[in-house]
Structure formats: structure tokens, C-alpha cells
Swiss-Prot record:
Keywords: Cell membrane, Disease variant, Disulfide bond, Glycoprotein, Growth factor binding, Intellectual disability, Leucine-rich repeat, Membrane, Repeat, Signal, Transmembrane, Transmembrane helix. PANTHER family: IG(IMMUNOGLOBULIN) AND LRR(LEUCINE RICH REPEAT) DOMAINS, TIR DOMAIN-CONTAINING PROTEIN. Interacts with TGFB1; associates via disulfide bonds with the Latency-associated peptide chain (LAP) regulatory chain of TGFB1, leading to regulate activation of TGF-beta-1. Interacts with TGFB2. Interacts with TGFB3; associates via disulfide bonds with the Latency-associated peptide chain (LAP) regulatory chain of TGFB3, leading to regulate activation of TGF-beta-3. Interacts with LAPTM4B; decreases TGFB1 production in regulatory T-cells. It is linked to Cleft palate, proliferative retinopathy, and developmental delay: An autosomal recessive disorder characterized by mild to severe intellectual disability with delayed or absent speech, hypotonia, cleft palate, proliferative retinopathy, and combined sensorineural and conductive hearing loss. Brain imaging shows ventriculomegaly, widened subarachnoid spaces, partial agenesis of the corpus callosum, hypoplastic cerebellar vermis, and Dandy Walker malformation. Residues 571-620 form the LRRCT domain. Gene3D superfamilies: Ribonuclease Inhibitor. It comes from Homo sapiens. Pfam families: LRR_8, LRRNT. GO terms for biological process: establishment of protein localization to extracellular region; negative regulation of activated T cell proliferation; negative regulation of cytokine production; negative regulation of transforming growth factor beta receptor signaling pathway; positive regulation of gene expression; secondary palate development; transforming growth factor beta receptor signaling pathway. Coiled coil: none annotated. The chain crosses the membrane at residues 628-648. Residues 1-19 form the signal peptide. Belongs to the LRRC32/LRRC33 family. This is Transforming growth factor beta activator LRRC32.
Length: 662
């Protein structure tokens, strides 16, 4: 009898548990439970005991107790982020012996109740811990962190830490990634990271550091120091082993000079943008001539930026960003050792000239950004920059360049010259005036922008034997395009822009460009287009703000199979006579941009939306015109008859009067 009673009690218990479980609004899939944003005030106690992943983020939890959390001993992933947790019961996570990932981000752990709770306690198997966004401050952090021998990733971002000491990261021998971004760190005590022998990734961005005077983390591979107030960066003078650093971010600081990085031979990524850097133009100075850190820092003596240090400094560097600095000149010696460099950004500086004339200079460089400087001269050697594919020169003052400046770049594919004063030469038979630049015969070039260069005449053969796929000649008011100026591009050109040039006549036989997909003729004074009588590849046609009144089917018929988008705003379109356009609108073959706002005019000058025009409207208009013509003809004939009749009567009367007098 007794076993039967026990069995009945067990069944009742299971039934009640199942009933309560059904009431829990959490989503359960296999061993994963999601209780996100449910307004929960405490950890649910009726979840499956074998749950391995529990997401309680976005609720209103204020305290974490050992019970019921300790019931879920199989937990591996626990997300408690974005709650209001300010109390952790001692040993709250002690029963979770399998826990590997714990997130307490964006809570209130800095409140006094968290202090009295004794911190997190030991986390023997946790590999990932997120404590970001808790207003944690120095001193409290040491009391909150417990023993975590397996911890690999720790996030302390978006807190209020001001100082790191030797004791901050104790008992974390396996830590590899440490995120401290967006704190208020001003001081890092010597040896603060000595207890982290496996640390490879360190993020110290968005803090208040002013100097790195004795960098000695040989094992570190990624270091982010961006968005601080760093005035100097110096490695240890006698490191115990070779530095492994490959990625260094120092952007948005206050560096006045290029740091001496000869001790970092493995560096492949270096970002120094948004600083105050000027490169030295003379011989190296002694340490007295170099900017020293602000007072309050016991920095080692700083050496001049070195390009000739032992070995080959920066010889493995692939990416260098020096944009938004105050560089006026690039010394020849600066580029000598950058033999592996692939990407160089020097935009937004004060450069007036750039030279790369030496044989083999920057042999691996693929992208060079010199945009938005004050460049007036550009000298590129015949065998320099042999791998360069992209050259960005927009926003400079280039003019009167050597004619074959770009023809010497054997691998050049993309060239942006927007906002300069470059004048293209003609073809081999029409070279052009002095100071023009040759764009013909550059067999590798695919994309060219000559926007806003004050070009007056585009000569015949300007791009002969240069298989461009994209050409932008916009914003050159008064541009005259000579017959044959785009000759040689018929089989390659896919994108052509001639916007804002004031063109009245287009001397380009567009139907011959069989690969053309996008054509921009906006903001000109065109009223006619050449006839596309055969099928072509054109998909997008921009005719905004021109003088088109009619787009007859005889001229546009060849576009029906390919055209997908047509821009026509700002043209004096006729409501009648545009049968081809109306058919495209009503049948939906072509997407005419903003069709509801596309206005056309009837002969009576009445303006309506083109999408509202029906064929019968034009038929009625035609009937009205015919009736008007008939009426006018009748009135004219009647007037002639009446005039003739009056004249005859007058003659007869005169004859009658003469006979009567006689």
C-alpha cells in the first residue's frame, strides 16, 4: 500500500510541475530556454532541470539567489544582461559547475548591496564573462571578481574604472581577450597585466590615457588604444622576448610624431588617423627635439621616428592609415621599408606634392588614398607602384601633370580625379594642348572619374585603347564632347555619367554602346536622343531636368527589353504624343521614378500627372482640335464669301449709279 501512495504522490508532483511549466511564458527548444523581455521579477523555478542555455535578459530582476538558480545544475550559458541586478547572494553560482558563459552586462552591480554580497565567487569553468555597463569603479572590481582559472574572455567595457593595479586581474591565468573600452582609465600600474601570460587581445579604446611609455606585453597580438589622449607611444627598451603585436590602433589621439615601432616587426595593421602627426623632413633629431609626454608620466626618453632602425622595421606592414593628420611632405626614406604595404591612406592631410619615383617603390601597394589634400604635383616613376589598382586623388588642386602620369601605372584599375583641374588629351592623332593628361592606351584602367575638372573640350580618341567600364564626366559646365571622343569604348563601357554639363546636343552615338547599363544625362538642356532601334543592355536612364517633351516609340523602342528604371522629373513632357512612355507606365514594364509627381501638359497648357492620363483624354483633345479647325475654317470661308459678296454688291451699285446719271 505504501509504494502505491508514494507513486501517487510522485505523479501528483509531476502533474503540478507540468501544470506550472505550462504557465511559464518562456520559449523552450530542446535544452535552450528564452525568457527575454517578459517583465520577470525573479528567476523562474519551474523550468526543465536539464536546461543548458537560459536567457533572462531584458527583465526586471533585482537579485540573484542560489535558489532557484541552483536547481539548474546543467546550465552552460546564462544571460542575465539588461536587468536591475544589484544583489548577488554569496554562492549564487556555486552549484552551476558546468557554467561556461555568463553575462551580467548592463545591471547595477556597483550599488552597495552588491558589495555586501561577496562578489561573484569562484567560477571554475566559466570561459566568457561580461560585466560591461555596470558603473563598476576601481577598488570594487577587485572585490567583485573571483577565481576564474578557465576564463578566456572578459568584458569590463562601459564602466567607470579609472585605474588598473597589479591585483585587478588576479587568478585569471587563462585570460586571452580583455575589453576595457569606454571607461575613464587614466593610470595603468606597472605589472597590471603580468598575471595574464596568455593575453592576446586588449581593448583600451575610449579612455583617458595620455601616454604609453613602457609597452612590454610581448605576447599581445591586438591592441586598441583609439580615442584616448595619447601623446606618445613607446615600447620597452629591453624586451625579454620578441613582440608578437600584429594589430595596433592609435586613431583619434594626440600624437605629434610617427611613433618608433622598430621593436614591432610583426605589425601588419597600423591606424594613426585623426592625430596631429607631422613627418620629419630632415635628419633624425636627438631626444631633446622630440615631443615629450605631459607632466605626471615617468616616460622613457623618446627617440626620433626611425626609418633605419635595426632590421627592417614595418617590413611586414600591410595596412597603414595616416588620414586626418597634418602631414605636409612624405620623405623618401619613409616609404623605403614598406615593402609589403598593400593599403596606404594619406587623405585629409596638408600634402602639396607626392613622389614615388624610385624603381620598385611600394611594390605591393594596391590602394593609395591621397584625396582631400592640397596636391599640386604628382610624380610617379615608370616602374614604381607596380601593383597599384586604386588611386584616389579627389579634392586636390592637380593641373598640368606630365602627360603619361597614369599611363605608367601598369596595374591601375580605378582612378578618381574629381575636383581637380585635369584636362584630358586626345588620341594619338590629336594629342591636345600642353599640360593635358593622356588617358588613352591604359589597358588596365576600368573606372575613371573626371567630375568637376572644368573640362572645356573632350577631344576625339580621348580614351582610345582604354577599356573603361565606368566613366563619370559630370559637373563640367560648358563641356563640348567632340565627335569620336568616346570612341573605342563601345564594347566595354557599362556606366556613363554626363550630368550637369549644360549639353544641348549629344555628339555620342549611344546605340553603339552595346554594354551600356547605366546612363546619366540629368541636368542638361537636351531635347532629343538618338534612336535605339535595336535591343541594347541599358537598364537605368536618367533624363531629369532637361528639355524633353516627347519620347517617341520610334526612338525608344530598342529599350523595351532591357530598361528597368527611367528618371524624367523636370522635363516639359507632353501628355499626348508620348504613347511609348504611357504604355510603359500602364503596363509596368519600366519603373518611372516618382510617377505620381511626373507632370505633363496638354496643348491647352493644362498640367496633370502623367500617370492619370488616359488614351481617351488625348482622343478627346484631338476631336476638340478637329472641331476647332472646322469651325475656324467655316468662319474663314464665310468671311471670304461675305467679303466677296460685299465687293460684288459695291461694284454693281457703282455701275448702276453711273447708268442712272447717264
Amino acid at each position: 500500500m505504501r509504494p502505491q501512495i508514494l507513486l501517487l504522490l510522485a505523479l501528483l508532483t509531476l502533474g503540478l510541475a507540468a501544470q506550472h511549466q505550462d504557465k511559464v511564458p518562456c520559449k523552450m527548444v530542446d535544452k535552450k530556454v528564452s525568457c527575454q523581455v517578459l517583465g520577470l521579477l525573479q528567476v523562474p523555478s519551474v523550468l526543465p532541470p536539464d536546461t543548458e542555455t537560459l536567457d533572462l535578459s531584458g527583465n526586471q530582476l533585482r537579485s540573484i539567489l542560489a535558489s532557484p538558480l541552483g536547481f539548474y545544475t546543467a546550465l552552460r550559458h546564462l544571460d542575465l544582461s539588461t536587468n536591475e541586478i544589484s544583489f548577488l547572494q554569496p554562492g549564487a553560482f556555486q552549484a552551476l559547475t558546468h557554467l561556461e558563459h555568463l553575462s551580467l552586462a548592463h545591471n547595477r552591480l556597483a550599488m552597495a548591496t552588491a558589495l555586501s554580497a561577496g562578489g561573484l565567487g569562484p567560477l571554475p569553468r566559466v570561459t566568457s564573462l561580461d560585466l560591461s555597463g555596470n558603473s563598476l569603479y576601481s577598488g570594487l572590481l577587485e572585490r567583485l571578481l573571483g577565481e576564474a582559472p578557465s576564463l578566456h574572455t572578459l568584458s569590463l567595457a562601459e564602466n567607470s574604472l579609472t585605474r588598473l593595479t597589479r591585483h585587478t586581474f588576479r587568478d585569471m591565468p587563462a585570460l586571452e581577450q580583455l575589453d576595457l573600452h569606454s571607461n575613464v582609465l587614466m593610470d595603468i600600474e606597472d605589472g597590471a597585466f603580468e598575471g595574464l601570460p596568455r593575453l592576446t587581445h586588449l581593448n583600451l579604446s575610449r579612455n583617458s590615457l595620455t601616454c604609453i611609455s613602457d609597452f612590454s606585453l610581448q605576447q599581445l597580438r591586438v591592441l586598441d588604444l583609439s580615442c584616448n589622449s595619447i601623446e606618445a607611444f613607446q615600447t620597452a627598451s629591453q624586451p625579454q622576448a620578441e613582440f608578437q603585436l600584429t594589430w595596433l590602433d592609435l586613431r583619434e589621439n594626440k600624437l605629434l610624431h610617427f611613433p618608433d615601432l622598430a621593436a614591432l616587426p610583426r605589425l601588419i595593421y597600423l591606424n594613426l588617423s585623426n592625430n596631429l602627426i607631422r613627418l620629419p623632413t630632415g635628419p633624425p633629431q636627438d631626444s631633446k627635439g622630440i615631443h615629450a609626454p605631459s607632466e605626471g608620466w615617468s616616460a622613457l626618453p623618446l627617440s626620433a621616428p626611425s626609418g633605419n632602425a635595426s632590421g627592417r622595421p614595418l617590413s611586414q606592414l600591410l595596412n597603414l592609415d595616416l588620414s586626418y593628420n597634418e602631414i605636409e611632405l612624405i620623405p623618401d626614406s619613409f616609404l623605403e621599408h614598406l615593402t609589403s604595404l598593400c593599403f596606404l591612406n594619406l587623405s585629409r592631410n596638408c600634402l602639396r606634392t607626392f613622389e614615388a619615383r624610385r624603381l620598385g617603390s611600394l611594390p605591393c601597394l594596391m590602394l593609395l588614398d591621397l584625396s582631400h589634400n592640397a596636391l599640386e604635383t604628382l610624380e610617379l616613376g615608370a616602374r614604381a607602384l607596380g601593383s597599384l589598382r586604386t588611386l584616389l586623388l579627389q579634392g586636390n588642386a592637380l593641373r598640368d601633370l606630365p602627360p603619361y602620369t597614369f599611363a605608367n601605372l601598369a596595374s591601375l584599375q580605378r582612378l578618381n580625379l574629381q575636383g581637380n583641374r585635369v584636362s584630358p588629351c586626345g588620341g594619338p592623332d590629336e594629342p591636345g594642348p600642353s599640360g593635358c593628361v593622356a588617358f588613352s592606351g591604359i589597358t588596365s584602367l576600368r573606372s575613371l572619374s573626371l567630375v568637376d575638372n572644368e573640362i572645356e573640350l573632350l577631344r576625339a580618341g580621348a580614351f582610345l585603347h582604354t577599356p573603361l567600364t565606368e566613366l563619370d564626366l559630370s559637373s563640367n559646365p560648358g563641356l563640348e564632347v567632340a565627335t569620336g571622343a568616346l570612341g573605342g569604348l563601345e564594347a566595354s563601357l557599362e556606366v556613363l555619367a554626363l550630368q550637369g554639363n549644360g549639353l544641348m546636343v549629344l555628339q555620342v552615338d549611344l546605340p553603339c554602346f552595346i554594354c551600356l547599363k547605366r546612363l546619366n544625362l540629368a541636368e542638361n538642356r537636351l531635347s532629343h536622343l538618338p534612336a535605339w532601334t535595336q535591343a541594347v543592355s541599358l537598364e537605368v536612364l536618367d533624363l531629369r531636368n532637361n528639355s524633353f517633351s516627347l519620347l517617341p516609340g520610334s526612338a525608344m523602342g530598342g529599350l523595351e527589353t532591357s530598361l528597368r528604371r527611367l528618371y524624367l522629373q523636370g522635363n516639359p513632357l507632353s501628355c499626348c504624343g508620348n504613347g511609348w512612355l504611357a504604355a510603359q507606365l500602364h503596363q509596368g514594364r519600366v519603373d518611372v521614378d516618382a510617377t505620381q509627381d511626373l507632370i505633363c501638359r496638354f496643348s491647352s497648357q493644362e498640367e496633370v500627372s502623367l500617370s492619370h492620363v488616359r488614351p481617351e483624354d488625348c482622343e478627346k483633345g484631338g476631336l476638340k482640335n478637329i472641331n476647332l479647325i472646322i469651325i475656324l475654317t467655316f468662319i474663314l470661308v464665310s468671311a471670304i464669301l461675305l467679303t466677296t459678296l460685299a465687293a460684288c454688291c459695291c461694284v454693281r451699285r457703282q455701275k448702276f449709279n453711273q447708268q442712272y446719271k447717264a
